[in-house]
């Protein structure tokens, strides 16, 4: 059988799709409503908009097929589980998830297609624990899953870089990317799931970073991070699939080469702050100083792998493989930077990542 939904379709029981469930015009909404467990199975389902309202506690929906959402998903009430049921929920390029909360989220992986920014409506064990990605330079497929589990059972928490004081031992996120394209990743902390040794330091500058488990060298790596206490989040740039979580840093030692970023840039030719100035007095300490700058949407506007050499400095103009026009002057505003460099530690070469804000004035 064939069913095309361009209107409002409400389903109150189990769904077994044995034919075509699709749409012609992007006007329809598929509503799943009830007070008992609803299974979603059979052939894949395509819908423009998606609405959940089921008062069943714990799991309200079990997704056993593939669900494609093209516009809006409204998580009004009811947890949708696909962690064990094996289904897939795909958000297409312009799709967005609304109202996710502890009573309504996806317990399992969520896939985002395209290049738009997105907040993943994910969680586990009755807690909504989102992750966010920025706008991308080109289309990608990125999947995110949250685990309310100690990562140490699989990824040794004692194997870590020296600047990492203590790793979140109650939760982690798995991020899988089809293409190794850089994106800004935002993770959140929550008093119900995040350990107190992290919560107690969220207002301390440079105390909370995102860390990544490097499967090749079997060690946790510091990926840096900029905290936002209004949103209970920390953000940094990533380009690898894998396991990420929060960590408390040795914040009194978090700048191993004493790199200083003067974050005001006013390229007006007066000789003061015409370019982004980065003080690297211990040049023998920091090597291969890589600098990336992103606008407020997470689009990369500048990149160099050897800042300061051969005139490679940020002067308010975009450069690199970007989605904004190359070598065009950027508008005034606040930008986000990520520095990465190599430095010597007792047992060999280490890599450090630092993040922060730049204030650009081109008026």
Language-model segment annotations:
Residues 186-188, 231-239, 312-319:
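Exposed aromatic-hydrophobic patches
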Residues 172-176, 235-236, 301, 326:
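Beta-strand-rich interaction surfaces with strong enrichment in secreted/lumenal proteins
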Residues 1-37, 42-49, 54-56, 72-208, ...:
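Self-processing/autoproteolytic domain segments and adjacent N-terminal interaction modules in large
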Residues 254-363:
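Short loop/turn motifs at secondary-structure boundaries
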Residues 177, 227-230, 306-310:
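Short proline/glycine- and polar residue-rich coil/turn motifs
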Residues 80, 185, 210-211, 244, ...:
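Residue-level detector of buried hydrophobic side-chain packing
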Residues 199-207, 213-273:
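Proteolytic cleavage junctions
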Residues 59-63:
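Beta-strand-rich extracellular passenger or scaffold domains
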